Amino acid sequence: MEYTFNKLTKKDVKKLKVGDIVYLNGKIYTARDEAHLKIIEMLKSNEKLPFDLNESIIYHAGPIMKKVNDSWVCVSIGPTTSARMNDVEEEFIKLTNISAIVGKGGMKKELLKTFEDYGVVYLAAPGGCAALLANSVKRVDNVYFLDELGMPEAVWELEVNNFGPLIVAMDSHGNSIYEEVNKKVYEKLNELIGL
């Protein structure tokens, strides 16, 4: 199935299955390694975040931005390898109540239980399409922690339109396209070498 969402709610997440195609409109936030750690640290210290991540979409990306007059313009925004956030993502999800993660390469299969328990979906963005994805960024609404973390690690609040195509690669029902592919590869390998 193919879906377009203006806001991806937990109810919407439950409808999505591995292999579905998704396009996003509305607000998304970038967050890589350092941003994840900063957000976790703040929330565990009972500090209020300067943005609301409840039922939001996090994009594992370190964009290239350009300042034009008083506004930021997105030049490039390709996905970061999500496995870099494997060790902190469970705690991040529990603390923030996000709805979706957009990234590249998937995440460890142990997170499928967390996705199921908290109603989260992992959407795979196509690698090598950073300039194309930047065309879907209609506006940069804000940037957080820029001075502290630097451009790629800062949290960028973006308004996107027709952002995609994204593939549901890990759903909230315990399914992973990566696990399915691995299983098929090993079955074929066993056929070929006669195990």
From Swiss-Prot:
E.C. code? 4.2.1.32
Where do the catalytic residues lie?
A: 36
The Gene Ontology terms for molecular function here are: L(+)-tartrate dehydratase activity
State the source organism's domain of life. Archaea
Any idea which UniProt keywords this protein has? Lyase
One Pfam family, short name: Fumerase_C
Binding-site residues, substrate = 104
The UniProt subunit note reads as follows:
Heterotetramer of two alpha and two beta subunits.
User: Which NCBIfam families does the UniProt record give?
Assistant: ttdB_fumA_fumB
Q: In its UniProt entry, what is this protein called?
A: Putative L(+)-tartrate dehydratase subunit beta
